[in-house]
Each structure stands twice: as structure tokens, then as C-alpha cells.
Amino acid sequence: MAPNIRKSHPLLKIINSSLIDLPSPSNISTWWNFGSLLGICLITQILTGLLLAMHYTADTSLAFSSVAHTCRNVQYGWLIRNLHANGASFFFICIYLHIGRGFYYGSYLYKETWNTGVILLLTLMATAFVGYVLPWGQMSFWGATVITNLFSAIPYIGQTLVEWAWGGFSVDNPTLTRFFALHFLLPFLIAGITLIHLTFLHESGSNNPLGIVSHCDKIPFHPYFSLKDILGFTLMFIPLLILAFFSPNFLGDPENFTPANPLVTPPHIKPEWYFLFAYAILRSIPNKLGGVLALAASVLILFLIPFLHKSKQRSMTFRPLSQVLFWFLVANLLILTWIGSQPVEHPFIIIGQMASFTYFLILLILFPTIGDLENKMLY
């Protein structure tokens, strides 16, 4: 019998074992679609970003007008730009749902996969931040100034670190140039870490909604989940295209239609919607260093999640108390997102402080406690 090239060719057999003949649990739900959706988001962002970079000029006097030129004069430049800007929002929607699914079903117990995933989230956040600075509008400039300035809270080396990052004594041309270089580089780093993420995942195999070992009931990835993933791509691209065609600026800030002016501060400096929860936590502490530490902790706390798992069951499928707590956490994050978009005044300050406190309380204390309690109730 002739050898199957799919299984014998050195390159094709890697693809085959990852995407075609991969043994997958038969009962994984649509919540397992988001990994592949993140992959397609990354590919879309790299392609649209590459096309935008061909028309972009990383110079403070030309950046804003080069983006305007792309939208007005380049063939379908407006569409490429709208897909890239809104594609970032969909990237974050997918990654937050992907993390939420991992949290709900106990996927974080695959520690290496989880940790590389958190590193991917941090890299994605860095990429989105430096990318937001590139159009050189008002919110781009002031966002860059405020967020990079946070590093000055680091004792002893802070101010030196900030000036080193800026390439001068304020956010200026060197800052924009290096941010463009970083924004071009980081997506390829994300692609590399994604391969490590998948390598670790394929070592253990996928988790499933029941959180039990599924070796006895595996099915091939293709055609079952490849088709399911294509359906997922379609269901994601439809709203993305609707947003890009009909209301491309819905998620943006109107302030960014004004070219950057170091002499005029916008009334409310705020990041894009996907950073608002962390921004609310940053603002809830009236001390600069404390706020920076809370901001870092709000994301880095994900590294601790595997160590805070106290339940004898992996998934939350049959743990009603943990489920209630999980949805409390989701509601809490939505409240933080809303607070981050509001001005710093009463009653938003106290609501933000309460929500920030609750966020850490749920993750660090209530989840392990409830896990222990459920063990006592069930066993």
C-alpha cells in the first residue's frame, strides 16, 4: 500500500497530528471554539496590519495624516483600517471568553498551557496598547503619556525607566517610532508563543465540560471540529463585518479624531473598552504605586489560579456554589468596565473601590473557600 504523504512527510505530519488526526474529546462544546477563533483573529490582524504598515508613516508630523490618507486615497484602505481596529476588539472578546471558559471548566489545571496563555494575554495587551498610540490622535498621545508614566512609580529606577522608554523627556517622535517597531514585532512573538501554547495543550489533550479523563471516547479533529470551527469563523466575521461597514467608530473614542496636541489635555483620558476593567482597578487606589501594583495584580493574579483550586472536582459543571460565584465575578468585571469609562467623581469612585475589592476577594478568598465547602458537602 502506498504511504500516506499526510502521515509521512516531515512537515505535513506535524500539521496532521495538530489539525487533522488530533484525538479530541467527543463532548467539547462551542466554548472550545475560541482557541481557533483567536488563531483566525491573529492571522486577520497580521494581514490587515501588514497592509496598513505599507501606507503608514511613523513620524509625529505625518502619522495622523498618513492614517487619514490610507482611509481616503488607498483602495479599500478604509475597510482595512476598520477591520484592523475592530478586529482588535473581537480579539479581546475572544480571549476573555477563552479565559472564562478555562476558568469555568478547570482547564487551568494544565499549568503549562495556562501559564503560556497568560503570557499570551500580557503580550496581546502590550501589542494593543502600542498599536493604539500609532494614529497619533489626542487619546493616543495622552493614553501613551499616562500609561508609560505609571512606570515612574517604581522606586529608585522609575523615572529613568520612563525616560528610557520615551527616548526623551516626553512622549515624542522617538516614542512613536519605537512603538511602531514594537507593534510590528509583537504579533509575530504572539504567533511563536501560540505554537508553544499548542505544544503544551497537545501533550495533555483537551479538557472537556465534565472535567473527566476522556481517552476512551476520542474522535478525530477533522472533519468534526474543523467544520464546527468554520461555523465559528462565520459567526465571528459576520458581526465584525457589520461593525466595520456600518459603525466602524462605535467602539473608538471621538477624541482620537483630533491630532495629538501636548498642550491640550482631553477632559477624560481613558483606554479602549477592553482595558477599562484594569483601568478602574488602577484608579480605585488613591496612591500611585498602590494603583500600579493593583493594576499589575489584576492580570497577574491569573498565574495563581491553578494554586487556588481546592475542589475535588475539576469542572464547575456540578458545583452550583462555584457557578454562582463565577457569575458574580463576571458581573463584577462588567461593573469595573463601566466604572473605568466614567469620570472620577462620586458615586463612581466608591463603586469602583468596592468592585476592585470584590474582584480580589472572589478570586483569592471566596473561590478556594467555596471549593473546600463543596468538598465537605459532597464527600
UniProtKB/Swiss-Prot annotation:
Compartments (UniProt record): Mitochondrion inner membrane
Residues the record lists as binding heme b b566: H98, H197
An annotated Gene Ontology molecular function: ubiquinol-cytochrome-c reductase activity
Residues reported to bind a ubiquinone: H202
UniProt-listed Pfam families: Cytochrom_B_C, Cytochrome_B
Topological category with respect to the lipid bilayer: Multi-pass membrane protein
Domain of life: Eukaryota
Membrane-spanning parts: 34-54, 78-99, 114-134, 179-199, 227-247, 289-309, 321-341, 348-368
Co-factor remark: Binds 2 heme b groups non-covalently.
Binding site for heme b b562: H84, H183
Family annotation (PANTHER family): CYTOCHROME B
Subunit-level organization: The cytochrome bc1 complex contains 11 subunits: 3 respiratory subunits (MT-CYB, CYC1 and UQCRFS1), 2 core proteins (UQCRC1 and UQCRC2) and 6 low-molecular weight proteins (UQCRH/QCR6, UQCRB/QCR7, UQCRQ/QCR8, UQCR10/QCR9, UQCR11/QCR10 and a cleavage product of UQCRFS1). This cytochrome bc1 complex then forms a dimer.
The protein's role, per its UniProt record: Component of the ubiquinol-cytochrome c reductase complex (complex III or cytochrome b-c1 complex) that is part of the mitochondrial respiratory chain. The b-c1 complex mediates electron transfer from ubiquinol to cytochrome c. Contributes to the generation of a proton gradient across the mitochondrial membrane that is then used for ATP synthesis.
Similarity comment: family membership: Belongs to the cytochrome b family.
Record protein name field: Cytochrome b
Native species: Casuarius bennetti
Name of encoding gene: MT-CYB
